[in-house]
Amino acid sequence: GMASKAGQVLGKLAKVAIGAA
């Protein structure tokens, strides 16, 4: 659903942020 989609997007952004940190 929408919540799981948002969770996937947030997880992806978090991964990118960690990679950039």
From Swiss-Prot:
Expressed by the skin glands. The modification Alanine amide is found at A21. GO terms for biological process: defense response. It is found in: Secreted. One of its GO terms (cellular component) is extracellular region. Keywords: Amidation, Amphibian defense peptide, Antimicrobial, Secreted. Antimicrobial peptide. Belongs to the gastrin/cholecystokinin family. Magainin subfamily. This is Peptide PGLa-BM2.
